[in-house]
Amino acid sequence: MDNIITNVDGVKVKVRVYDFGDEVADRYTIVYVNKNIKDGYGVVYYPVFSCSENPFHPLGVGMYAGDYYPHRSHMYNFGKRVKDIDSLPKKVIEFIKYITR
């Protein structure tokens, strides 16, 4: 279920993508699980990004949304899991490649 994508630097990275549907501006949530980062207490977390269908458009959304702590997974609602990354809009895939560099 974890999606592997090649970023703009040519490195394969693992992301999880979720979809809230078209009722919200920041429809897609991307969890960058390839980076195993620890906070000041040694707890692992993953960077989370949010974007619209066209994150590079002046009226689009494409931003860092915070951090995901796996041990607190019951506290998050990211939407429905996207199983096939290739089914995403091309601009969203481009955004994922950019943020995972």
For each feature predicted by the language model, list its residue ranges:
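Acidic, low-complexity, intrinsically disordered interaction modules
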Residues: 19-86
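Short, charged/polar N-terminal "headpieces" of proteins
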Residues: 1-27
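Short acidic DE-rich linear segments
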Residues: 98-101
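A short, charged, amphipathic alpha-helix used as a generic interaction element across diverse proteins
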Residues: 88-96
